[in-house]
Amino acid sequence: MKNLFSKVSILFSWVVLLMLAVILCPHGALANVKPAAGGMLFVGIGGMIVNASTLNNIFVNLKTTFNRCFDATPTTWNKIAMLVPSGTKTNDYKWLANFPRMKKWFGEKAVKALAAFNYTVTNDDFEATVEVDRNDIDDDELGIYAPQAEMAGYSAKQLPDEIVYDLANGVFTKTCFDGQYMVDVDHPVTDANGVVQSVSNKGTAKLVCTTQAGAIASLGASRTAMKKFTDDEGRPLNIKPNLLLVPPALEDIANVLMNNDRLDDGKANPYKGTMEVLCDARLTSDTAWFLLDTSKPIKPFIYQERKKPVFVQQIDPQAEDVFMRKKFKFGAEARAAGGYGFWQLIYGSDGSV
């Protein structure tokens, strides 16, 4: 009899609890909610019911927002850099030193051996992570996360830009495949007689549009120097500078040089329409400017991609972070790196003189 009374009491208690839950949960939503298979059920009184299905729907929406913003975000890195897919931790670029060119065939073929230069680029890990507090899901306060998902998508799409323009900022201080700085005064090049010469792709002139003479001494001299670059057999490389890369401080000057019929002194502008102007606010020097030849298969900069940016999430209700801190997570992950291509395809001036 006591056992029967005990069972009846327990059953009555469960009935009372169920009735209270139905009354307190709006619109009788609890009647249609079941725990996901193998999952936990959280009930947010007066708010959203948190279970595996709810979480999945929430993060599907966040992923959709992420992808929409990712696809809509413009980039410019591919104007000045080439994409190199990576299948390993590190890529070796010593082949840049000995790129073969067609020539007349006399006797045996001249086989280009790989040079002894050691130029490798190791992939780095990148991430952007957002925490979602379980209370915000309980309280149906998820609107604050849509802008964060958009920014995560924007940031992920901009990763190649960030890497490539950081490379541009480092051309005067970071080495390329020949062991010299990417923009330097003494790149070793063998001439037609087999003698090693020092070749410069670095200037100091300010970019100016005030006079024709000043424009010729800065922009014109740099263009001429690039066009005279030769390969390791003394043959002209046929460099054609077609892009003028500048920081915001030099954008107006660059546009005058590329668009105006006449310069500030009233004389004819010999450089109108000769190059595209590319301005990026991530260039940190207000005086440095660069000429690039981007018309060839190889570009001045390399974007090495091991893993494209992807949306990731951690939504297991039983994960330690959820149990201990009530935190779910979403964000983006990628593996990539950057490096320098042919130094002959860029001419840089620090604008110091």
Locations of regions flagged by a protein language model:
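N-terminal secretory/membrane targeting signals
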Residues: 1-32
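Sequence/fold signature of self-assembling virion shell proteins
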Residues: 25, 32-36, 42, 49, ...
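Assembly/oligomerization interface modules of large self-assembling protein complexes
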Residues: 68-124
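Short, charged/polar micro-motifs that form catalytic or ligand-binding hotspots
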Residues: 88-92, 116, 120, 135-149, ...
